[in-house]
Amino acid sequence: MHQSTLPCDFALPAEWEPQSAIMLTWPHAGTDWKPYLPEITDTYLELADIITRYEQLLVATPDVPATRYQLKKKLSAEQMSRVLLYEVESNDTWVRDHGPLTMVLRRKQNTWMVPYRILDFKFNGWGEKFRWEKDNAITLKLYYQAAFNADIENHQGFVLEGGSIESDGKGTLFTTSQCLLAPHRNQPLDHDSIDHLLQTFFQLKRVVWLDHGNLIGDDTDGHIDTIVRVAPHDTLLYVGCDNPEDEQYEDFQTLEKQLKGLFTWEGYPYRLLKLPMPDPIYDEGDCLTTNPESEGDRLPATYANFLILNKAVIYPTYNQPEKDEEARKQIQLAFPDREIIGVDSQTIIRQHGSIHCITMQLPEGALRDSTFHI
């Protein structure tokens, strides 16, 4: 890690800073959700219901009339007035990774600058594992439809997913070496080269690389938003594993040790809040089970994959009441002034993601049609 010498006119805001909207890319029969499309659509409608209580909702969908019809059956007229629908084709719905990464102008004296800047990185299906070409084009298509109150920078020469980075809004970016150094992303670039590029793109003071904590079943090669999340007042919420019988035990114990050795840019230790590790969940094709004798694939269930709204936090639950409640309490400690709302995410994890993975926040003012305030 080293300090950037670049002028810091712009910053990548922390997720808890004021927002204009949350973006969703809507599920449809052409996505991998097809086998359980009714169930995942219900989950998206539940998310839309919660989000529109607090802020606007931008929806990218290949079928605006059908999606509007679904939303109108669930939402009130007042909530529907906060929904913005844009017609865009998609391969899948993981907007955290194909959506816009929005920088905000911090030095307000630079009045000649557009105060928001979208960085459009290349999304390639997490190293060309899945179809990605349509998803990679979504941000630019929304820009040309005048969805954003922002300039846009083309960074299609560099692969980067939103779920692979966490910003504290003060110049520190967290990421994982397992993901950013994974094959089929940015080779032959090495650690130092990628570190320098991240500092340049996001005008950072430093990048903190985490080297452990890769969830079994994670298709992303270890996204930071599945294991460690940044919260206000130099707080890190992280997934712990205290069960020596869990095959992930050693890896997450080592992650915990690394976190305890980290210091803020100012030289203080971080406040650490441990989230529980959900009991293992296995996909047996026609159903999910927590039976340890299952021969199904283990899914990457995690409580770290929560979404921060203006006055609330939506966090994933997994029909594990004690652990669901323990996670809620820890998240509440990090966000004492926000309502903590659980959403059953058992359908989402069947495609190896959770709530944060299917959502993307837009900072306050970055949306072209931004008239709603709460």
Residue ranges of predicted features:
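The feature marks the mature, well-folded catalytic cores of soluble enzymes
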Residues: 1-374
